[in-house]
Curated annotation (Swiss-Prot):
ATP binds at R257, R258, E259, V273, E344, L345, T346, S347. Catalyzes the attachment of serine to tRNA(Ser). Is also able to aminoacylate tRNA(Sec) with serine, to form the misacylated tRNA L-seryl-tRNA(Sec), which will be further converted into selenocysteinyl-tRNA(Sec). SUPFAM superfamilies: Class II aaRS and biotin synthetases (SSF55681), tRNA-binding arm (SSF46589). Keywords: Aminoacyl-tRNA synthetase, ATP-binding, Cytoplasm, Ligase, Nucleotide-binding, Protein biosynthesis. It is found in: Cytoplasm. Belongs to the class-II aminoacyl-tRNA synthetase family. Type-1 seryl-tRNA synthetase subfamily. Consists of two distinct domains, a catalytic core and a N-terminal extension that is involved in tRNA binding. Its EC number is 6.1.1.11. It catalyses: tRNA(Ser) + L-serine + ATP = L-seryl-tRNA(Ser) + AMP + diphosphate + H(+); tRNA(Sec) + L-serine + ATP = L-seryl-tRNA(Sec) + AMP + diphosphate + H(+). It comes from Corynebacterium glutamicum (strain ATCC 13032 / DSM 20300 / JCM 1318 / BCRC 11384 / CCUG 27702 / LMG 3730 / NBRC 12168 / NCIMB 10025 / NRRL B-2784 / 534). This is Serine--tRNA ligase. The keyword Ion transport does not apply.
């Protein structure tokens, strides 16, 4: 959530952010009004409590004959205090409700929607094939890497098995990401994939896109779509030490997404699935360091994409395509030959203090005063990278050259077609 003081001091900035996102700017004025009512309710309750305290002293000093009347007045005042505290509680609940609806303030992102991104950099040239390239699923099946048929049989649409060298290719990619993260000072974690509602809400995922999340009603738990959620909750209600610099974690987990709003999109292969694996970077830092950290995360993503040897571009995502918690987001998109377009492989978001304020994660400034931390996240490797690896590294004979950085994990330089059983 955003800082109420910032909102009061900069209402036009927040209204403009809402407009950039394609969201309702009237929510800003509604929250400002609710905040004014809350502050009035707090003052009214404080004044009555002060009056009640003074009245109590008066009773203690009263004569026996005056005390009964004063006690009657005290009871009336007690009832007023109770009503005022109830009004304060209701006013605070209303402010919290509206704060939870308001997205983070966009910072530097271009205006517009999904198609209004700005290309910041293009790295590598799309390959020109002297044969008709196969898509990743055809390659995956012929090489014995992907089994969609049995995945669908066992679990339904958008499920799959990674088999043989396909499993090793993914494990190698994730291990390489973990190694690079450790070398860069990240602490590795394998976090829970089930989280409580307050953690999911704290990261900003229970807004307009909550239908994308798997919910276990019987247990009142959510399956995460990214380890960002559990890593953000790790320091909930804590004061962390940032004196030596940012606190950096890399979470390796399975991720789950309902893909409720994507009916008919990317139904072939493993680009858009219900379950996948990912190594996610997550950083806590001082707010003034957040923009530099954001560039560092993007740099690590670019280093990984260079290692898997695919052409890609970096885009600055438009405000209308940002998630609720992100003030700015950079995506990298790899070239997918059979689709003749770029597709997202990584995202890195600067969430400023939005998540940490909800989760009450703080640090102490140079004066020892607790302040809200900033949080950032970024993808370092994930299952859909296999799409780009297979398609961009395929050969005319149907084989796929394994990127050099992944060969120690896969144990092969080239993946060759195999005869499929069943």
């Amino acid at each position: 959530m955003i800082d109420l003081k910032f909102l009061r001091d900069n209402p036009d900035v927040v209204r403009a952010s809402q407009i950039t996102r394609g969201e309702d700017p009237a929510l800003v004025d509604e929250l400002i009004s609710a905040d004014e009512s809350r502050r009035e309710a707090i003052k009214a309750a404080d004044d009555l409590r002060a009056e009640q305290k003074a009245f109590g002293k008066k009773i203690g000093q009263a004569s026996p004959e005056d005390r009964p009347a004063l006690l009657e007045g005290s009871n009336e005042l007690k009832a007023k205090v109770k009503d005022a505290e109830a009004a304060q509680e209701a006013a605070e609940a209303k402010v919290n409700e509206l704060q939870m609806k308001l997205s983070n303030v966009v910072s530097g992102a271009p205006a517009g929607g999904e198609d209004d991104f700005v290309v910041l950099e293009t790295i590598g040239e799309p390959r020109t094939f002297d044969f008709e390239p196969k898509d990743h699923l055809e390659l995956g099946e012929s090489l014995g890497l992907i089994d969609m048929k049995r995945g669908t049989k066992v679990s339904g649409a958008r499920f799959y098995y990674l088999t043989g060298d396909g499993a090793m290719l993914q494990l190698g990619m994730l291990m390489l990401a973990a190694q690079k993260a450790r070398e860069a000072g990240f602490s590795m974690m394998i976090p829970p994939v089930l989280v409580r509602p307050e953690i999911m809400a704290g990261t900003g995922f229970l807004g307009d896109h909550s239908e994308e999340i798997y919910y276990l009603e019987r247990d009142d738990m959510y399956l995460v779509g990214t380890s960002e959620v559990a890593l953000a909750g790790y320091h909930k209600d804590e004061i962390i030490d940032l004196n030596e610099g940012p606190v950096k974690y890399a979470g390796w987990s399975s991720c789950f997404r309902r893909e409720a709003g994507s009916y008919g999109k990317d139904t072939r292969g493993i680009l858009r699935v219900h379950q996948f694996d990912k190594v996610e970077m997550f950083v806590y830092c001082k707010p003034e360091d957040a923009e530099d950290v954001h560039q560092q995360l993007l740099g690590m993503e670019k280093e990984m994409l260079a290692a898997i040897e695919v052409p890609y571009r970096v885009i600055d995502v438009a405000g209308g395509d940002l998630g609720a918690s992100a003030a700015r987001k950079f995506d990298t998109e790899a070239w997918v030959p059979t689709q003749d377009t770029y597709r997202e492989l990584t995202s890195t978001s600067n969430c400023t203090t939005f998540q940490a304020r909800r989760l009450q994660t703080r640090y102490r400034d140079e004066n020892g005063k607790p302040q809200i931390a900033a949080t950032l996240n970024g993808t370092l490797a994930t299952t859909r990278w296999l799409v780009a690896i297979l398609e961009n590294n395929q050969q005319a004979d149907g084989s796929v050259v394994v990127p050099e950085a992944l060969r120690p994990f896969v144990g092969k330089d080239v993946l060759k077609p195999v005869k499929q059983a069943g």
